[in-house]
From Swiss-Prot:
<dbReference type="GO" id="GO:0005524">
    <property type="term" value="F:ATP binding"/>
</dbReference>
<dbReference type="GO" id="GO:0003724">
    <property type="term" value="F:RNA helicase activity"/>
</dbReference>
<dbReference type="InterPro" id="IPR000629">
    <property type="entry name" value="RNA-helicase_DEAD-box_CS"/>
</dbReference>
<keyword id="KW-0690">Ribosome biogenesis</keyword>
<feature type="domain" description="Helicase C-terminal">
    <location>
        <begin position="334"/>
        <end position="496"/>
    </location>
</feature>
<comment type="similarity">
    <text>Belongs to the DEAD box helicase family. DDX5/DBP2 subfamily.</text>
</comment>
<comment type="function">
    <text>ATP-dependent RNA helicase required for 60S ribosomal subunit synthesis. Involved in efficient pre-rRNA processing, predominantly at site A3, which is necessary for the normal formation of 25S and 5.8S rRNAs.</text>
</comment>
<dbReference type="Pfam" id="PF00271">
    <property type="entry name" value="Helicase_C"/>
</dbReference>
<feature type="compositionally biased region" description="Polar residues">
    <location>
        <begin position="69"/>
        <end position="86"/>
    </location>
</feature>
<keyword id="KW-0698">rRNA processing</keyword>
<feature type="short sequence motif" description="Q motif">
    <location>
        <begin position="118"/>
        <end position="144"/>
    </location>
</feature>
<feature type="compositionally biased region" description="Basic and acidic residues">
    <location>
        <begin position="1"/>
        <end position="33"/>
    </location>
</feature>
<feature type="compositionally biased region" description="Basic residues">
    <location>
        <begin position="34"/>
        <end position="65"/>
    </location>
</feature>
<keyword id="KW-0378">Hydrolase</keyword>
<dbReference type="GO" id="GO:0000464">
    <property type="term" value="P:endonucleolytic cleavage in ITS1 upstream of 5.8S rRNA from tricistronic rRNA transcript (SSU-rRNA, 5.8S rRNA, LSU-rRNA)"/>
</dbReference>
<feature type="domain" description="Helicase ATP-binding">
    <location>
        <begin position="147"/>
        <end position="318"/>
    </location>
</feature>
<dbReference type="InterPro" id="IPR014001">
    <property type="entry name" value="Helicase_ATP-bd"/>
</dbReference>
Amino acid sequence: MVEEHKNKKRRQEDGPADVPEKKVKVSKSEKKDKKEKKEKKEKKEKKEKKEKKEKKEKKEKKKKYEHTATISGSAQSSQGYTQSESLTNLPQSEIDSFLATNEVTIEDPHSLNLRPLLSFDQIQLNSKISAVVNKFPTPTPIQSVAWPYLLSGKDVIGVAETGSGKTFAFGVPAINNILTLGKSGLSVLCISPTRELASQIYDNLVDLTSNTNVKCVCVYGGVPKHDQVKNLKNANVVVATPGRLLDLIEDGAVNLGTVDYLVLDEADRMLETGFEDAIKAIIGGTKKENRQTLMFTATWPQEVRKLASTFMNQPVKVSIGDRDELAANKRITQIVEVIEPFDKEKKLLGLLRQYQSGSKKNDKVLIFALYKKEATRIEGLLRRNSYNVAAIHGDLSQQQRTNALNSFKKGESSLLLATDVAARGLDIPNVKVVINLTFPLTVEDYVHRIGRTGRAGQTGTAHTLFTEHEKHLSGALMNILRGANQPVPDELLKFGGHTKKKAHSAYGAFFKDVDMTKTAKKIKFD
């Protein structure tokens, strides 16, 4: 008994004996749960591994892209413009004579002092472009001065009258860069204020790229989007009006992230017509770094200066002619008649008999109305009087406007009736006479209207009908007439000089100029 007690105590101290474990029975549902948990864990680990791999690949791809971009940037830099020996050897007196004759002023914050090109053999371009530009005798003044700076990769502001060869001024360096650097995808964007001007720029660029594989596309409102969206695929150059381009961006049809050559043509016109916010939004979508920006404008008002200072990098400003001072082309004979408002239609018919009689029967005459309804009414008047007239204004479809413009250019119609949509930028050759049936809202528009004649070194005539309704503009008009050495009629003098002569005829003597060398500052409000 005592021995049994001792053995029992010993067993308690030594611990439990090695006895076989009893198996616990696991239910099917528990097995299923365990399996699902295991699969879920494996799936999660697999997903994390995949994400980690993708993240690594993305990082390596970005690094590779940045490296490529650096190489491309240095290649572009090494491709920088080199002045030809023949241009370098020209005497300075010849350069000075060119600058003085063409009233060229250059403001260069980089102090590069690049000489203007006086002939095409002084510039080295891709052979496919040279074949096109060599068809012209010499570069225009804006091309001569702008090309060296643009080919050097600088931002440029060109202040020059319309019809001065601005499309090739920015188009030649743009296409040359695409061909030389072997760029693919969307690289060049040109924004234009009107459908007609956008189409004109597009046609010129198509001619320039006719020997290349560079794809140019034009997008504007007034026509269906479908074909434009289709054409945008694989485009290298896009010419667009601001409204339609914004629509296409919002639709996801175009991505401007690769655009490194941005052109604003007729910048002053776009600001006048309320496109400032659209322009800023479009610029915001383009490439931020290493973007080359160009702005072409016929005038240089404060609004344009401010816009340029916000998104351009120390631009070189090139002015052809006295563009700070609003002035009319001196090759245009300006005639101003003060009449009663109700005499306009009768007077118009008399002027057409005067300017389209005898040997002048087929001379091109451009008539400006102020409003669309007025244009429609006058078009009917002229047709009733057996005149073959074409018309362009906002109530017409894009196809109708294009047909009318082509008809006038080809001489099928010798009369073109237009609202101010045609006053800026359009290249309409050989217009002999401009008739202002109704005076425009500003003298700036007056100067641009009459600038449709007297182009490319030719002379022209501008005949303006002025009424008491516009007398508040009489002083500004007199300044324009005197500045171009044109007679001021006594009837106009009777209205008095409502606008005094100032240091700047359009913007006064006390506007603040903008320093282009300073970057924009961010203002934070607490």
